[in-house]
Amino acid sequence: MNDSITVRGKDRYKSGVMEYKKMGYWEPDYVPKDTDVIALFRVTPQDGVDPIEASAAVAGESSTATWTVVWTDRLTAAEKYRAKCYRVDPVPNSPGQYFAYIAYDLDLFENGSIANLSASIIGNVFGFKPLKALRLEDMRLPIAYVKTFQGPATGIVVERERMDKFGRPLLGATVKPKLGLSGRNYGRVVYEALKGGLDFTKDDENINSQPFMHWRERFLYCMEAVNKAQAASGEIKGTYLNVTAGTMEEMYERAEFAKQLGSVIIMIDLVIGYTAIQSMAKWARRNDMILHLHRAGHSTYTRQRNHGVSFRVIAKWMRLAGVDHIHAGTVVGKLEGDPSTTKGYYDICREDYNPANLEHGLFFDQPWASLNKLMPVASGGIHAGQMHQLLDLLGEDVVLQFGGGTIGHPMGIAAGATANRVALEAMILARNEGRDYVHEGPEILAKAAQTCTPLKAALDTWKNVSFNYESTDTPDYAPTPSVSM
């Protein structure tokens, strides 16, 4: 089945229906060029459908093919523009599923456009009837394509310089409850959290401009809180002002107002769409603003293993698009996140070059062509008692956001912030002293709590609470590569 079965010559363009694998979309001898975009799909064919034909159909329908032969193919450089499925492997331990490797000529894509890239790669093909399910698992983006994108507007290094925070993770909290607070009370939460020791607070994904608190009111009270907290602490502080709105004009207006008020950071939601994200990233670059992206909505298509788009692909696209922060999982929190898979997401965000690593779900080497690094954000169900685990699993270049773990503190918001800051500082000190902070973590925290009542209260309240559920999206790691079909 490794032989090419492409029909050549005039028979290739006879009117009628022809199998995709015979039209040139299956080329097992093809060697991808350095400039090719490569997509790895998990293909689940309908019963009785040949996996080679199903994979060739994915290549065809995501590039130049339609359901029947069209003579106008002869007016194009058809051999060049056809996507080529060159390898199909059975997925380890998943009967009926196949990994299809498909190469696309770079000329098929518009420079610097995630919208155009996604329109081809995840366009109509996901509704193709011969497939039970289809998932985009990973992509190899060539340097020639990567360099057409801006990349993160600010980047990790410059963000740390602006915030004057070095040698430790940044600390944040999402204001809770996310909906219903007045502007004045919202600002009080921001002030207490920042005064207590956090670096950032943030709006949640669905706080925009509602009857109980219009956006301008929120921005004014939040920035008043930031300025007061900076004066009280002597540290640079920030709050993610969510500028997500119904139109680009409204988002630009909100972003400009945030800038006028002196904010160092604004926020957008993934649901605004790829073009809007890139537009806001370009605005942030021009205006020296950090851009935080909340991945609201991603689990509708990233969570299931057999259908949709892997978050590792979304992370790659967002690094290209130009955001500075992205929620990337916590492992130990309340949201989906297999440890190995999550490490792969963090590698995509923070490394200059990603070598293939099947254990972390990375199928391809990925160069980043000096694009700025993207700061991953960990949030959702984390608390001070997990600090040693978070530092070990996620490293130093990360924002740890304790929403409930700050605002739910029994002694109040400022005490919750202090508990998190003291826990982090104690763990960083232990790490820098060469201690085995992972195994000694509970002991280190208990000792720090002896001189910090807020930390003791946090540890007594949440103890070792964790959300230990089996992940639905785990790497299909095989010790040896499967044999090409």
From Swiss-Prot:
The record marks K334 as: Transition state stabilizer. Mg(2+) binds at K202, D204, E205. The keyword Magnesium applies. Substrate binds at N124, T174, K178, R295, H327, S379. Binds 1 Mg(2+) ion per subunit. It catalyses: 2 (2R)-3-phosphoglycerate + 2 H(+) = D-ribulose 1,5-bisphosphate + CO2 + H2O; D-ribulose 1,5-bisphosphate + O2 = 2-phosphoglycolate + (2R)-3-phosphoglycerate + 2 H(+). The keyword Cell membrane does not apply. It is an enzyme of class 4 (lyase). GO terms for molecular function: magnesium ion binding; monooxygenase activity; ribulose-bisphosphate carboxylase activity. Keywords: Calvin cycle, Carbon dioxide fixation, Lyase, Magnesium, Metal-binding, Monooxygenase, Oxidoreductase, Photosynthesis. The basic functional RuBisCO is composed of a large chain homodimer in a 'head-to-tail' conformation. In form I RuBisCO this homodimer is arranged in a barrel-like tetramer with the small subunits forming a tetrameric 'cap' on each end of the 'barrel'. RuBisCO catalyzes two reactions: the carboxylation of D-ribulose 1,5-bisphosphate, the primary event in carbon dioxide fixation, as well as the oxidative fragmentation of the pentose substrate. Both reactions occur simultaneously and in competition at the same active site. Heterohexadecamer of 8 large chains and 8 small chains. This is Ribulose bisphosphate carboxylase large chain 2. It comes from Rhodopseudomonas palustris (strain BisB5).
